[in-house]
Amino acid sequence: MLGAVEGPRWKQAEDIRDIYDFRDVLGTGAFSEVILAEDKRTQKLVAIKCIAKEALEGKEGSMENEIAVLHKIKHPNIVALDDIYESGGHLYLIMQLVSGGELFDRIVEKGFYTERDASRLIFQVLDAVKYLHDLGIVHRDLKPENLLYYSLDEDSKIMISDFGLSKMEDPGSVLSTACGTPGYVAPEVLAQKPYSKAVDCWSIGVIAYILLCGYPPFYDENDAKLFEQILKAEYEFDSPYWDDISDSAKDFIRHLMEKDPEKRFTCEQALQHPWIAGDTALDKNIHQSVSEQIKKNFAKSKWKQAFNATAVVRHMRKLQLGTSQEGQGQTASHGELLTPVAGGPAAGCCCRDCCVEPGTELSPTLPHQL
């Protein structure tokens, strides 16, 4: 049974709609629905993950782990869990609403984008992940899709979401479960070896690589061949895409995408690298090259995974401008439905923590030479 999680117990409510005004369905997960809602007391907009308790049977451990992790976290660059309610046969996780859209979308929309912009983004990610690591938490699924902008403001901060695969390290225990997203997972995970916080640092290196060229360091249609590349840590800084990128940026990436986890930079070491802490990140506009590669390698496939993130951002703009009229165009459900793909995660507006998906397990097809 759910309940044996760290942190305060959740609150009881006879009817959650007495507390929150349910607006729109933002997305549907494996056993949850995500609702854009307004707190009737404060008029604050939130994202509510609505979970049928009967659907959690056999999955209680995963849910308890996620809640326990979220209860421990309070960082300006990490999506927050505000409250938990139990009402009827449902559990309601009240999450901070993140309304600025996804990382890739914002980069593509920009007209000007530089190494320095990428450096500032990675600084925020490193600072947040260092905070997690200091608490003994390993995220285990860091990737661009889990980096969301807090608001529509031009200088909005970035937020880390989706703690469905995160794990708190227990003293004396080792992490060994193969999980994560192919393409971002560290070699030691694929090699089915015990691993540590260093897996997150590898993933940050992969993200930094993509932010500077627009394509992934490892790619193959065949998972086994993809895993072979990752196991060997075989990646290149291809010409012409990397010709205008500084040597400092490449050095930074090499230290994070180091095959040996013992030699790999920690978050603390990465934060001290000149590309982050110094003045070596270049100010040359690389937007055209990077955005073209993002659109070619990521955007379309990503946007097809869920409903159009642009529609959600547009909806949020209307809400912020006060032009959204309550009751107009309502359906029998929760107002204006944004029609997510069945089973797909919510995108853009809601934090991905709200979208409980099946655990992202690696393909069982691993290369033979482990």
Swiss-Prot record:
The modification Phosphoserine is found at residue 363. Phosphorylated by CaMKK1 and CaMKK2 on Thr-177. A motif (Nuclear export signal) lies at residues 315-321. The modification Phosphothreonine is found at residue 177. This is Calcium/calmodulin-dependent protein kinase type 1. SMART domains: S_TKc (SM00220). Transmembrane segments: none annotated. GO terms for cellular component: cytoplasm; cytosol; nucleus; postsynaptic density. InterPro entries: Kinase-like_dom_sf, Prot_kinase_dom, Protein_kinase_ATP_BS, Ser/Thr_kinase_AS. Its EC number is 2.7.11.17. Calcium/calmodulin-dependent protein kinase that operates in the calcium-triggered CaMKK-CaMK1 signaling cascade and, upon calcium influx, regulates transcription activators activity, cell cycle, hormone production, cell differentiation, actin filament organization and neurite outgrowth. Recognizes the substrate consensus sequence [MVLIF]-x-R-x(2)-[ST]-x(3)-[MVLIF]. Regulates axonal extension and growth cone motility in hippocampal and cerebellar nerve cells. The active site is at residue 141. It is found in: Cytoplasm; Nucleus. The autoinhibitory domain overlaps with the calmodulin binding region and interacts in the inactive folded state with the catalytic domain as a pseudosubstrate. Its main location: cytoplasm. Residues 276-316 are annotated as: Autoinhibitory domain. One of its GO terms (molecular function) is calmodulin binding. Activated by Ca(2+)/calmodulin. Binding of calmodulin results in conformational change that relieves intrasteric autoinhibition and allows phosphorylation of Thr-177 within the activation loop by CaMKK1 or CaMKK2. Phosphorylation of Thr-177 results in several fold increase in total activity. Unlike CaMK4, is unable to exhibit autonomous activity after Ca(2+)/calmodulin activation. It catalyses: L-seryl-[protein] + ATP = O-phospho-L-seryl-[protein] + ADP + H(+); L-threonyl-[protein] + ATP = O-phospho-L-threonyl-[protein] + ADP + H(+). Changing residue 49 to A: Catalytically inactive form; prevents CDK4 activation.
